[in-house]
Regions:
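Short beta-strand-to-loop acidic/aromatic patch adjacent to the donor-nucleotide binding site
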Residues: 2-13
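Acidic donor-binding/catalytic loop of UDP-sugar-dependent glycosyltransferases
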Residues: 12-25
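Short beta-strand-to-loop element that shapes/binds the nucleotide-sugar donor at the catalytic cleft/hinge
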Residues: 36-53
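Active-site donor/metal-binding and catalytic loop motifs
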Residues: 41, 102, 124-144, 153
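A recurrent flexible, glycine/aromatic-enriched loop bordering the glycosyltransferase active site
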Residues: 65-89
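Donor nucleotide-sugar recognition loop
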Residues: 77-83, 92-125, 129-132
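Catalytic core of nucleotide-sugar-dependent glycosyltransferases
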Residues: 128, 141-168
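Non-catalytic, C-terminal membrane-associated alpha-helical segments of glycosyltransferases
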Residues: 145-149, 164-206
Length: 206
């Protein structure tokens, strides 16, 4: 029987020592309510911007490995990106990814929201668990795949935008400081919430 589930895109290259970083982090947590993710290196975006090619044919593996120690990032808060690791019991409890997000747009934040509702507060991107991502070759850049309107599906399902969820709940793109707390309901929160509700009203008529 296996205890952990690692979800990855099929256009990702796992950098050395990723498994040890993940194993050590899981040992430190000592419970099953967590969502641990890697740090993406991409040609034009990602957590770390570094060009080693946009396809497997162009991939300069040696360049990546020779410079990996220079590609720095802190452990980061609220990551919702692949690759990620969760306990298999937690995956089963929330029924994994939701089918209405097929073929995948916004499926990650939806999964995170289901985990949040289940009481998960550790959403941690690991600085030393690095992958090189060639950039959505399976879905977004594939002309044969019809894209789902995942952001609208998320909005209708949860009543807020993915951006609102990532900003006020997951605190995405900030340095990891520990388990997350409930959103701070200040002026910015309510202003952004109002924008979410206005957008919800709009997409409801589409």
């Amino acid at each position: 029987k296996f205890h952990y589930l690692i979800y990855s895109h099929d256009d990702m290259y796992f950098c050395p020592n990723w498994a040890k970083q993940l194993k050590d982090e899981i040992k430190k947590i000592q419970h099953n309510k967590y969502y641990l993710s890697g740090s993406m290196i991409e040609q034009n975006s990602g957590h770390i911007k570094y060009d080693c090619g946009s396809t497997i044919e162009e991939f300069n593996e040696q360049k990546l490995l020779n410079n990996l120690h220079n590609l720095k990032i802190d452990d980061h808060q609220g990551s919702h990106f692949a690759p990620h690791c969760v306990h298999v019991d937690l995956w089963k409890k929330v029924d994994g990814f939701s089918k209405e997000f097929n073929p995948g747009i916004a499926s990650d934040p939806d999964f995170n929201m289901k985990l949040w509702k289940e009481g998960v507060r550790i959403f941690k991107g690991l600085s030393e668990f690095k992958v090189y991502h060639f950039g959505s070759l399976t879905t977004r850049k594939n002309k044969n795949v019809k894209q789902n309107r995942g952001d609208n599906t998320f909005l209708k399902k949860w009543g807020i935008t993915t951006g609102f969820f990532k900003k006020h709940y997951l605190r995405s793109k900030t340095k990891f400081k520990g388990p997350l707390e409930e959103p701070k309901k200040n002026l910015t929160y309510y202003f952004d919430l109002l924008k979410s509700k206005i957008k919800l009203l709009y997409v409801s008529f589409l």
